[in-house]
A protein has these predicted regions:
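Conserved short histidine dyad/triad with adjacent acidic residue
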Residues: 31-57, 82-83, 87-92
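Short, surface-exposed secondary-structure edge patches
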Residues: 61, 78-79
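A short, N-terminal "cap"/entry segment at the start of jelly-roll beta-barrel domains
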Residues: 1-39
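A generic structural motif
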Residues: 30-32, 72-74, 99, 111
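Short, conserved beta-strand element in jelly-roll/cupin
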Residues: 56-70
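Residue-level structural signal for beta-strand termini and adjacent loop
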Residues: 42, 75-77
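Ligand-binding loop in jelly-roll beta-barrel domains
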Residues: 91-112
Length: 112
């Protein structure tokens, strides 16, 4: 029986992707059919880092698994609020800013 909180039959990169001196990190998960996703954690922003900025190579659908945050996509004026169970899409060759007051867990579905 498969759990909705677990992936079966996958490979996981041993070394994490680490950004902002360890404040954000993720692990790449490879599926048998070739799909690639990233499971990550974002520690809270503070006075030193009021928002995180990330750049994308390919389209990404980022699903919030736990916590809440605000996201501003490239070209947008305002931040949009997201919480667990919600997702946002970032175009390839673009960027976004994320700010949060508590730990956020996410899965990044690489779309292209």
């Amino acid at each position: 029986m498969t759990s909705p909180n677990r992936f079966d039959h996958v490979s996981v990169e041993k070394i994490a992707n680490v950004y902002y001196e360890g404040r954000t990190f993720s692990r790449t998960v490879w599926f048998e059919d070739g799909r690639k996703k990233m499971l990550g954690i974002v520690l809270p922003c503070d006075a030193d880092v009021p928002a995180y900025e990330f750049k994308t190579d390919s389209s990404e659908r980022i699903e919030i698994l736990a916590g809440e945050c605000e996201v501003k996509l490239a070209g947008e004026e305002e931040f949009t609020y997201y919480r667990a169970g919600q997702a946002f899409l970032v175009e390839g060759h673009s960027s976004y800013e994320l700010r949060n007051e508590a730990i956020v867990q996410y899965i990044c579905h690489l779309e292209g």
